[in-house]
Design a protein with these regions (language model features):
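Surface-exposed loop and turn segments in beta-propeller and other repeat-based domains
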Residues: 1, 41-55, 146-156, 192-209, ...
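Short loop/turn segments that connect beta-strands within beta-propeller blades
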Residues: 31-35, 90-94, 136-143, 189-192, ...
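Acidic, serine/threonine- and glycine-rich low-complexity intrinsically disordered segments
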Residues: 98-208
Length: 305
């Protein structure tokens, strides 16, 4: 199961994790140097008081706390993996700050780097899409004309991440496969403004993509990794080392979070999977991530494998 490890923002010996897929609704601190553990958040009784069938509390593998590690956004499931609610939790004060009943189970949730917003992302649900809620789920969002407690960031749930722009503001970075150019874009969580960064539908091709915005100490940059590219004329055929392969395919690169962004290639992510691997083929995706000051990058590859 997924323990969702999250490193302490300043102590490299400490991380936080949830039990197997959030069962038990606790958050534990682990010192990897001493192997000492302590429960820093036992949310079970409180969550059951809101939702009697509550059984798990997690981000569903794709979320993170605020950049300072204080604020957490968690989705709550029952023992049948049906979503019942979302909460925000203050680790410093061990206090529930807000909660919301769920109209449908999200694909994942995450706290924004600033700790001001809980981003809830629903897959295959254009009405709900991906939304940035105010931390208590009741205060109207400043960018909502209808005085709702959220702004809609996207009509889909795509591979995405939350990052900080150069001004230190929260942004949502994702790809829009429904756009004419398959744009990679960002949305400012405070203003709701969307900015296109670069197209991905190049010369009849498309690519799968991941983002990491975890370089909070280097605001204004995100990490991008691509894989699984294809041409519209033959989606089953690899473009590797052909004239149809484009500049971004099979790459790890940094992108500045601004209009007309800088693109800085970092590495080749020459990774392919085999159908015989079954579900393990998922781990052939590069899924690149970056450290807090953008001096280290980690990614998967099957090159020469």
């Amino acid at each position: 199961g997924d323990a969702e490890p999250q490193w302490h923002p300043t102590n490299p010996d400490v991380l936080y994790y949830v039990p197997n897929n959030g069962w038990g609704m606790t958050i534990t601190e682990l010192n990897v140097a001493s192997d000492q553990r302590r429960v820093v958040g036992d949310l079970g009784a409180r969550l059951k008081s809101f939702w009697p069938t509550a059984a798990t509390a997690w981000t569903k593998s794709e979320g993170a706390p605020s950049a300072d590690g204080r604020y957490w956004c968690l989705m709550v499931d029952n023992n049948q993996w049906q979503g019942v609610g979302v909460v925000t939790w203050d680790m410093k004060e061990d206090r529930i700050l807000g909660r919301m009943n769920l109209p449908a189970r999200p694909d994942h949730v995450s706290m924004s780097p600033s700790g001001q917003y809980c981003v809830v992302s629903w897959a295959h649900n254009r009405e709900l899409g991906t939304r940035a809620y105010t931390r208590d789920f009741t205060t109207p969002h400043a960018a909502s004309a209808a005085r709702q407690p959220y702004v809609k960031l996207h009509e889909q749930s795509e591979h995405s991440d939350l990052a900080l722009n150069k001004q230190g503001e929260d942004v949502y970075v994702a790809i829009d496969y429904q756009a004419d150019r398959g744009d990679v874009f960002m949305v400012n969580l405070k203003t709701g403004k969307r900015t296109s960064l670069f197209p991905t539908y190049l010369s009849g091709t498309a690519t799968a993509i991941h983002f990491s915005g975890k370089a909070y100490g280097k605001p204004g940059w995100a990490l991008v990794s691509t894989y699984g590219e294809y041409h519209a004329s033959n989606q089953a055929s690899s473009l590797r080392n052909t004239a149809m392969q484009q500049w971004m395919h099979r790459k790890i690169f940094a992108v500045s979070l601004e209009e007309n962004p800088q693109i800085r290639p970092l590495a080749h992510a020459d990774s392919d999977s085999k159908s015989s691997w079954g579900s393990d083929a998922y781990w052939a995706e590069p899924q690149a991530t970056v450290n807090s000051d953008f001096t280290r990058v980690l990614f998967n590859s099957t090159l020469n494998g």
